[in-house]
Amino acid sequence: EDFGIPLILQSTVIEVHGDERLEAVTIAQVDEQWKPIPGTERTIECDTLLLSVGLIPENELSNGAGVQLDPIANGPKVDDTMMTSIPGIFACGNVLHVHDLVDNVSKEAERAGSFAAQYALQQLPAAARRVKVTAGENIRYVVPHEVSLDKPVEFFMRVQKPQEDVVLDVGGLRSVKKQFVKPSEMLNITLTPEVLSQLSGDTLTVRIVSPKEAGRQ
């Protein structure tokens, strides 16, 4: 509560009050499907309501080309070369998923550009093995959606709900302790080919778990 301003999480505005000017808002807690929970309503007097409704990737070109989209991230599904489901079409930046930092957009663009150039020159090597990447417990989405095991891969993801004192686990191959996670802050983690090659199955699941659960792996 910086400066005495309370932070109310997992709640939404369900009603605004006032005739010629705003006088109050009614808020309510929401469930895991983000639907208001009856009986949790409370009214707060105020004269200003600021809305931050988020960003949605613009994908008219992707839709027109028939690129397969991630229904959660609202961007194209890509592999670790940033190639979409249509060979020769690559995606990066906010068209792929909404980023927090322009630094990550720039790095992603360089990566996509490099692989696109290799593809155009017919120098992009075919992967000997690919695995699907899936979002597990408390992970809303993860990018990329498919990876090979022969190059370093940086994964980006967002959580579904805030949690404290947890562990970010990537397929049981690597775990990182997190003091807290929240949907508004993107998480990222890089796995080397040496680590990725230890995967035994054909699916890599990214999830948020408790330290105790992570210790049982």
Question: Where does each model-flagged region fall?
Answer:
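Short, solvent-exposed loop/linker segments at the N-terminal edge
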Residues: 145-149
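Aromatic sugar-binding surface patches on proteins
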Residues: 183-192
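Short, aromatic- and glycine-rich surface loops/edge beta-strands on solvent-exposed regions
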Residues: 155, 166-170, 194-216
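Conserved mixed alpha/beta catalytic, RNA-binding, or beta-rich assembly cores of soluble enzyme
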Residues: 7-9, 42, 69-71, 108, ...
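FAD-site-proximal beta/loop scaffold in flavoenzymes
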Residues: 47-99
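A Rossmann-like FAD-binding core segment of flavoenzymes
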Residues: 1-60, 151-181
